[in-house]
């Protein structure tokens, strides 16, 4: 009888321990199948988040507005994407904070039909972007501004993720679009003209950021910190582990051509930010740009939208230094 009770107690305690150490289930989004959006893929597919006690499901949500809506509606716990979405929502009163950024430059190139030889020949042409208010929109407007043109000088076509826009360009339904590898690599090989690499533009930009609801940061700070650890470790893997990263790239991007996978990796890996701190100049440039059109952005400071306190904690604890050893 005593033996039976002892076995029952051991089984009960075993279940308690398994439950206590079970990974916490969370949902994070990613914006598409381009290399700059890969931090969450790597964290999930290489089981990095599990090392930090998290069972993370990742879902694709295209467009900043949809990503913000999913986060505010509690459909996701963490959102990733350009800072335009959380900034635009925050100036309207939404409780959002940008915590980190894996990519602090535009990753795009402006691609056109071969017969378009310079920016002035874009006048009246059909330019396809994902949506208004996102990084595609801002990249287009900043490029036109550098070329001395206005948005009204072109026909803006809205809709379509990167593969869809690539297909529209190659089928002749549009004249120009904004792409990054691997889609940029494919169209360049096919003879389409790269009019400008937006990474070379003077403007800084928080392209791939990690953001959460401010209430989550306060109420679930440890959980958010563990996710940030996994996110940062995934970025470190991208920059240092070519073989494993390229396998994930090939799978997630559905690319069979090893050369395209290689060029995509070589384009993005050096440009990732590690540690993934937000470049406040990029946030400031975005605020200043939107302030010309929206008075809500006037006299606002990056620090109102960005909270890097967890980044500071991880830095102080030596987390980033340990990953680099």
Describe the residue ranges of each PLM region.
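Sec/Tat signal peptide C-region and signal peptidase I cleavage site
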Residues: 17-22
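Secondary-structure end/capping motifs
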Residues: 218-299
